[in-house]
């Protein structure tokens, strides 16, 4: 399910350039972020089978209903612990798996909420298949359990 919890020692020192990302509350509803714009970022390939960039890349994609994503991949492929996002010519690619998809916490806020973790897709920016992400909200109880340990 692409979820890991890491302990960092020594603790990270936050600054104007380094800040934490918010996590959404637990919610097992699949479509709670549908229609929102999400930012994906990573060091993955620039196109399927292509080269990796020299700088961190970012793209904006839109969260789509899981029913639409299931229609693309085949019924029973996408589950409530996943969410999907797409935009013309934009996507995550090989090397981006495990990276974030974040949404602005509020329209005029500088805070971001990580709603998903890049999981898989068919090709990169394939117009017939959205990118698939593990839902952070679905796994929030599991994340909280391991963060307490």
Predicted regions and their residues:
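Extracellular "complement/coagulation-type" protease architecture
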Residues: 1-149
């Amino acid at each position: 399910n692409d979820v890991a919890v890491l302990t960092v020692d020594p603790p990270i020192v936050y600054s104007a350039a380094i800040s934490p990302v918010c996590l959404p509350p637990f919610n097992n509803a699949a479509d709670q972020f549908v229609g929102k714009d999400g930012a994906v970022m990573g060091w993955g390939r620039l196109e399927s089978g292509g080269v990796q960039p020299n700088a961190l890349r970012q793209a904006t994609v839109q969260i789509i209903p899981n029913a639409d994503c299931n229609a693309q991949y085949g019924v029973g492929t996408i589950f409530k612990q996943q969410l999907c996002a797409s935009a013309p010519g934009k996507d995550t690619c090989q090397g981006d798996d495990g990276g974030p998809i974040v949404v602005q916490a509020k329209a005029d806020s500088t805070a971001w909420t990580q709603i998903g973790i890049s999981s898989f897709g068919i090709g990169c920016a394939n117009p017939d298949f959205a990118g698939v992400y593990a839902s952070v909200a679905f796994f929030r109880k599991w994340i909280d359990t391991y963060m307490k340990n």
